[in-house]
Amino acid sequence: PYSTPLNDAQQKGNGRRLDIKKNRIRSTYFANGILHYAYITPTSAFGAVSAIAYGRYDVSTKSNTMTYIGATGFNYAFPAIMHFSNLDAKNNTLITFLASNNTIYPEVRALMIDEKMQASASIQVKAGDSYVNYGIGNNERWGDYTGIARKYNSVNPEVWVFGCYGETNNRWGNYLAQIMAQPDLPP
């Protein structure tokens, strides 16, 4: 289901909330006849927080498969997705996203979804250093600049991810990181 999260995200050290009510498909790519897509959604599976909905739409069969990615009590938001295998025929996806709650500062994370729609454990790409507090009003803008790019023709699966985190000056910091994995073996 496609709906807007009810509450904005909390952040450690400050009562100001992070705006997550920008609900729309955030990222897509097309490979092997499948449209891969991701967006933010509320789901009761992780409490009253936002999660990431990741889907695969098979164009030829017109079938859709979904999975929800989150952690109890944590807001996961603003996903960016990309094919993550050295084998073009393999439907592995890397998702980078932003995370926050009242026990952590806003940070950048990533995980992989395999061909069977199973998610790996998420990894911390960049920890937040502090809370964000520089906007006007009760909420801080969040998630405007999350991105991902694949390095094509690489021996290993390789992507570059970009996201924002809380800097020590209480503003947003930008972070760019390379993520690689061991090569997939042909069937």
Show where each model-derived region lies.
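C-terminal PAP-associated
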Residues: 1-186
